Every structure is written in structure tokens, then in C-alpha cells.
């Protein structure tokens, strides 16, 4: 499998500084873990009964750099390692973790997690069933193992390119971060899965100023890729110029209108609205507890027949993709909404067992310190049949939203407020003036029923998304084609109240 980009055209050699990133039996080779040890830890976890137990080993190496005022202001490299032990008894979960991978400390964590149960000891399934190998991100040299000088070069190039774009660009901040996460997941049901998960991301933020007015633009990209990714088509200059373009554009933008009107969402990153206002409501834990607006609606119409929404953790190189989830289950493509009909939820092992549904491979966690829960991977709406130009031409008066900043959503009812960081007026079927201060206010399930046109131009985001839930952050992908929402409330600059919705 070849990556969808070319290597650096000058033949740059990004040499390794650490050879320890081989994913094959990482914890066996580097920490002396054996299958006998794993069986012993699981037996300790089930020593007081319990329906299920698992172990999550993690070794994370990471790098981060930040350039501000044309100089490197921060640089960090780090390593963390640990093991989390979970015991499930009915609907109760016991969890304990340790950053010491010695046998004594893992056994102590296992016995601590076991305190949730109070029944005769159970015996784990004899022997492990190892997951079939899959390689969605087969990098030869993970970014975290490349020379730091090459990473410094990237952020300095971004700073230079943004400042050269226009003299009105007065402030630039460029950042780079990468990591390599080695995991081992074993469970009392025989699960055995290993993975080595690379991740890299670059961001550029620019501030333009003139006549007492200022505006910000941001851009970036990445994925489960090697450092060479940033020396190809998706390079620092591309991100820097895009961030600068956005900032300059906003300097002359006019105030956003207010009221209910047609809204056209551009392809790609605007899919964050779908992710937040709809996607979280389709996670199984919320539906099991009946706190989601979508609870009990399987088989019912929840969207326009033009809407098909999927979550797909199997896309090569994508930020939200995983060979296996954090419970050792292979990820998959899950159809959530098909032609407007709700088909299913995103589940982990616990939700699947308690709800009597299939495990979709969406059990994710931030680190060994956290319990897994149902989470999205790459969530997007499939392309439709409409041409983007026809969608714009169909709007007499409305807003074209291209990029989004922050937002808030209440999972229980789907209400959301999102700020558009780049948007334009649509007047008489044409995109006209840029606008600033636009917020989109609505209800996720309701908005989907108002989608009347879906473009044939599906696009995924550039690989910068991070999703937060219950204090845990995980990398994700989002995407949509151009789509038209017939009626949506647009709040202009004068509107300050965001309705108090939860993030």
C-alpha cells in the first residue's frame, strides 16, 4: 500500500533517532511481558467474579514544537507508558491503572479493579485469539523517530510563508506535533490485539491587522502519516497561505445578517457540525441511557432521504482511523443513517452487551488512564447527485459557510450553536460578499430533515480534528459534501447569547 502523496522531491533523507518503533510484540520485547503473565493478570482481575476483564498496555512517545514571533518558543519530547485494568460486572465498571509496568504493580491494579465485583472467581478463556493483521497506516519511519531539525524546518517555513503573504499579517503562530502509540489489548474473552499508531499534525494561525481592525485565520493538516507527508503537496507553505488568506479576507468582511434563511455548507471541515450535532447523539452509551435525541428511533426517519451518514474507521492514513479500537476490536464502516432512516448506533463492548447489539469497533479512550467508551472515528455524509454550482444557484438569499470555529451542542435535544469562521452571502444565486460574526443556531435532528440538496463533491477535513467527550480527547475525522439546508437560524454579530448549550 503506497501513501497518497509523493516523497520529498529533493530526495530528503529523514533519518531515525530511535529504532524502537517496531510494532511486532512491542511489550513482549521491550518489557518482557509473556502470555503467561497476561493470563495471570486477567485471573487476578476476575478473582472476585465479574463478567469481563481486559488489560490495555500503552507506550506513547511524542514531540511538539511551536514557533511564535519567528522563533521557536517551545519544544518538547516525551514518553509515557502504563497499563489500565478494567473489570465489568453487570452495569458496574471497576478501573485501575499504573505507570509502572512491573508484574507487582499490574497485579495490584488488577486486584483493585476487581473490587467492583463480589462473586466467586471466574476463569478467563483459555488461550488468546489474535486479531488478523491489518495495516491502514504502514509508515516506514514514524514521524516521532525523525530528526527534530526537520520538524523545526517545517514550522519556520510556515512562519516565513504566512508573513510573506501580505504585509498586513502581523502575528503568526505555527505548531507541529506527532506521536507514536504502541498498544496491546488482551481480554478475558480471548481478545489479543497489538497496534502501532502514528499520528502527526501541523497548524498555522495568522492575525491580520489594519486601521484598528484585526482578524484571524487558521489552517493545518495531518493524519496517521510520516513526516514526508509535510514535504509533499500538503506542505507548510500551503497551510500558511491558507491561514493568511482567511485572516486578510475577514478584514473587509461585512457584518453577518440575522434571521432564518437558507444555508449552504461547504464540503469538508463543515462536517464538524454533523459530528457534533448528530454524531454524538448516535453513540450507543447516550442511547442506552436514553439521554440522546435519537434514543428509540432505529428504523424511523430522522433525516431527509438525501442524507446517508457513515462512520468509517478503516480509511487508510486518516486521522480518525484505527486498525483496531482500544478494546482490540477491528474498526469498520458503520452506516448510521441510510437515505434518512436511522440504522444503528456506534457501540463499544459494554454498550453492545447491555443493549443486545453488535459491537461496531468504536470503543476508544484517550490513554491507559481512561476507560473506553463509544466514540466516532471518521464520520461523514455520503455524496449526493447535485452539482455544487446548482446548489448555490438555487438560493435567492442565504449564507454559504465554508469554515467553522467553536461550537456548543446539547446531546439530549440536539440543539447547537456554531460560529462560522469563513462565510459569504448568497444573493440571487451567486456567492457575493464575505461576512463575519455569523453563528448557526439549530437542532441537529431537525436540520437533517431540512436538507434539500446534497452535492457530488464529498470532502474530508485536512486531518486536524480532536473530539472531546467526558474529559477524554481522541483524534477524529469529519466530512460532508456541499449541502443545502432550506431553513436555519443565522445569528449575526449583534447576537451574544449562545443558549447555554453544553459542549
Which ranges hold each PLM region?
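N-terminal small-residue-enriched
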Residues: 5-7, 11-503
Amino acid at each position: 500500500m503506497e501513501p497518497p502523496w509523493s516523497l520529498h522531491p529533493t530526495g530528503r533523507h529523514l533519518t531515525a533517532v530511535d529504532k524502537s518503533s517496531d510494532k511486532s510484540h512491542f511489550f513482549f520485547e521491550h518489557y518482557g511481558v509473556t502470555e503467561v503473565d497476561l493470563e495471570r493478570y486477567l485471573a487476578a482481575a476476575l478473582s472476585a467474579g465479574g463478567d469481563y476483564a481486559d488489560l490495555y498496555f500503552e507506550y506513547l512517545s511524542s514531540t511538539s514544537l511551536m514557533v511564535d514571533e519567528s522563533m521557536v518558543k517551545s519544544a518538547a519530547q516525551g514518553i509515557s507508558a502504563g497499563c489500565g485494568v478494567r473489570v465489568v460486572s453487570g452495569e458496574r465498571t471497576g478501573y485501575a491503572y499504573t505507570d509502572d509496568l512491573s508484574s507487582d504493580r499490574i497485579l495490584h491494579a488488577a486486584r483493585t479493579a476487581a473490587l467492583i465485583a463480589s462473586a466467586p472467581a471466574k476463569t478467563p478463556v483459555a488461550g488468546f485469539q489474535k486479531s488478523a493483521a491489518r495495516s491502514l497506516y504502514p509508515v516506514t519511519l514514524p514521524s516521532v523517530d525523525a530528526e527534530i531539525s526537520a520538524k523545526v524546518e517545517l514550522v519556520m517555513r510556515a512562519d516565513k510563508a504566512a508573513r510573506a503573504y501580505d504585509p498586513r499579517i502581523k502575528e503568526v503562530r505555527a505548531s507541529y506535533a506527532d506521536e507514536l502509540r504502541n498498544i496491546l489489548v488482551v481480554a478475558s474473552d480471548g481478545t489479543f490485539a497489538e497496534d502501532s499508531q502514528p499520528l502527526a499534525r501541523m497548524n498555522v494561525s495568522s492575525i491580520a491587522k489594519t486601521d484598528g481592525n484585526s482578524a484571524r485565520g487558521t489552517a493545518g493538516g495531518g493524519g496517521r502519516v510520516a513526516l514526508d507527508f509535510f514535504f509533499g503537496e500538503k506542505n507548510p507553505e500551503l497551510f500558511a497561505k491558507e491561514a493568511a488568506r482567511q485572516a486578510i479576507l475577514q478584514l473587509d468582511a461585512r457584518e453577518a445578517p440575522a434571521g432564518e434563511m437558507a444555508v449552504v455548507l461547504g464540503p469538508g471541515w463543515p462536517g464538524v457540525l454533523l459530528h457534533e450535532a448528530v454524531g454524538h447523539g448516535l453513540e450507543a452509551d447516550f442511547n442506552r441511557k436514553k439521554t440522546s435525541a435519537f434514543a428509540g428511533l432505529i428504523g424511523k426517519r430522522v433525516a431527509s432521504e438525501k442524507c446517508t451518514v457513515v462512520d468509517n474507521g478503516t480509511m487508510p492514513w486518516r486521522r480518525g482511523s484505527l486498525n483496531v479500537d482500544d478494546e482490540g476490536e477491528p474498526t469498520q464502516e458503520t452506516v448510521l443513517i441510510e437515505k434518512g432512516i436511522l440504522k444503528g448506533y456506534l457501540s463499544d463492548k459494554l454498550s453492545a452487551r447491555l443493549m443486545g447489539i453488535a459491537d461496531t469497533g468504536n470503543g476508544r479512550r484517550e490513554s491507559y488512564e481512561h476507560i473506553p467508551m463509544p466514540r466516532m472515528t471518521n464520520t461523514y455524509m455520503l455524496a449526493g447527485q447535485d452539482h455544487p454550482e446548482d446548489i448555490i444557484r438555487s438560493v435567492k438569499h442565504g449564507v454559504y459557510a465554508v469554515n467553522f470555529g467553536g461550537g456548543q451542542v446539547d446531546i439530549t435535544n440536539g440543539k447547537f450553536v456554531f460560529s462560522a469562521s469563513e462565510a459569504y452571502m448568497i444573493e440571487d444565486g451567486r456567492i457575493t460578499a464575505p461576512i463575519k460574526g455569523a453563528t448557526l443556531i439549530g437542532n441537529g435532528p431537525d436540520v437533517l430533515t431540512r436538507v434539500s440538496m446534497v452535492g457530488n463533491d464529498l470532502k474530508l477535513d485536512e486531518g486536524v480534528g480532536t473530539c472531546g467527550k467526558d474529559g477524554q480527547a481522541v483524534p477524529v475525522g469529519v466530512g460532508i459534501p456541499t449541502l443545502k439546508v432550506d431553513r436555519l437560524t443565522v445569528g449575526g454579530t449583534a447576537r451574544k447569547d449562545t443558549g447555554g448549550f453544553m459542549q
